[in-house]
């Protein structure tokens, strides 16, 4: 996508926010950088996000986000004839506003979807690449207040995922290594849930929190992923304008199971990831907020024979500016 097209999208969304009683509009980017061995995965991802109130005095809130992924590492290392997808567009849409409260318990769900379309370069050798993905998502957000200081919570999403694999298919019963046809898989699944979390509010209004996180991803006739992770962090309100929120994520278990219709079906391999970082927010004025995030991540993986792969280290950077109306 060239700069002109991206500018037109930003302009259209900006005009739309005025027409639909926008709560806020956010512009930003994410950048992922890997060590030399894996740096073909380096990406730069600009985005725009809008929160809308379609009806005045209604609790209904609509969220729309557009992000463009430029995998410049792949272009840098393989050129314009790179065999794999190098660019991707993502659209997210969510609706929320309903809230059920019963004494100390609250239930405030959110529903929506994520859609991704990838640019896949065609080659003589068929490769299994997903060029379209639709993930329907339900967020069963719940909280329970023990007292004024302690709160338990559940957050995250669950939902089915539909993938179209281009230029070869996953290894199902009809797999052909020379096929260049597309195949759609309707029974994939994706969820990320903090199944139980706890927050403790300190006397100075800062918050300490910890949670048990589960990720499950099913790619039919390819691989299934099951992760259990410990997450913890500290929300530090330095003053009325600046907040810094350091966090740690540590895998307790991360198992990948082979789901191909081959002799490797059912084999497992272990992975382990550790992430250390922080988010930051600075309120420039009552309607303008600067945001950011940085983290370092180490990933250890192995193959289905139990052989360790070289560690995959990543640095992540994010910068955003949000205008409230």
Please identify what each model-predicted range represents.
Residues 1-26, 57-61, 309, 325:
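Cleavable N-terminal export/targeting peptides
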Residues 21-79, 316, 322:
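Short glycine/proline- and aromatic-enriched beta-strand/turn motifs that initiate or cap beta-hairpins
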Residues 23-25, 56-64, 100-108, 148-154, ...:
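Repeated loop/turn-to-beta-strand initiation elements of outer-membrane beta-barrel proteins
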Residues 29-37, 52, 66-74, 97, ...:
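Transmembrane beta-strands of outer-membrane beta-barrel pores
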Residues 40-46, 50, 83-91, 130-138, ...:
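Residues that define the transmembrane beta-barrel architecture of outer-membrane proteins
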Residues 46-54, 91-98, 113, 138-144, ...:
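Residues on the lipid-exposed face of transmembrane beta-strands in outer-membrane beta-barrel proteins
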Residues 141-263:
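Detector for outer-membrane/organellar transmembrane beta-barrel domains
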Residues 282, 294, 311-325:
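Outer-membrane beta-barrel "beta-signal"
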């Amino acid at each position: 996508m060239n700069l002109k097209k991206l500018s037109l999208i930003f302009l259209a969304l900006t005009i739309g926010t005025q027409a639909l009683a926008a709560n806020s509009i956010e512009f930003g980017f994410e950048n992922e950088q890997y060590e030399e061995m894996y740096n073909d995965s380096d990406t730069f991802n600009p985005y725009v996000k809008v929160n809308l109130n379609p009806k005045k005095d209604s609790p209904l809130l609509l969220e729309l986000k557009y992000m463009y992924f430029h995998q410049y590492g792949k272009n840098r290392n393989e050129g314009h004839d790179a065999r794999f997808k190098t660019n991707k567009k993502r659209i997210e849409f969510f609706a929320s506003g309903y809230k059920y409260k019963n004494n100390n318990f609250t239930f405030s769900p959110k529903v929506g979807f994520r859609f991704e379309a990838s640019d896949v370069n065609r080659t003589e050798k068929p490769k299994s690449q997903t060029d379209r993905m639709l993930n329907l998502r339900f967020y069963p957000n719940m909280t329970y207040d023990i007292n004024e200081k302690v709160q338990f919570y559940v957050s995250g999403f669950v939902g089915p995922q539909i993938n179209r694999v281009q230029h070869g298919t996953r290894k199902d019963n009809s797999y052909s290594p020379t096929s260049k046809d597309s195949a759609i898989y309707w029974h994939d699944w994706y969820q990320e849930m903090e199944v139980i979390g706890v927050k403790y509010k300190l006397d100075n209004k800062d918050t300490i929190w910890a949670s048990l996180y589960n990720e499950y991803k099913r790619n039919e006739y390819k691989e299934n992923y099951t992760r259990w992770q410990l997450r913890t962090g500290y929300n530090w309100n330095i003053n009325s304008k600046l907040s810094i929120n350091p966090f740690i994520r540590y895998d307790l278990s991360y198992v990948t199971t082979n789901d191909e219709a081959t002799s490797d079906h059912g084999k497992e391999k272990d992975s382990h990831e550790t992430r250390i970082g922080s988010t930051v927010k600075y309120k420039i004025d009552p309607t303008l907020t600067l945001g950011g995030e940085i983290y370092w991540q180490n990933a250890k993986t192995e193959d289905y024979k139990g052989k360790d792969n070289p560690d995959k280290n990543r640095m992540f950077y994010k910068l955003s500016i949000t205008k409230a109306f």
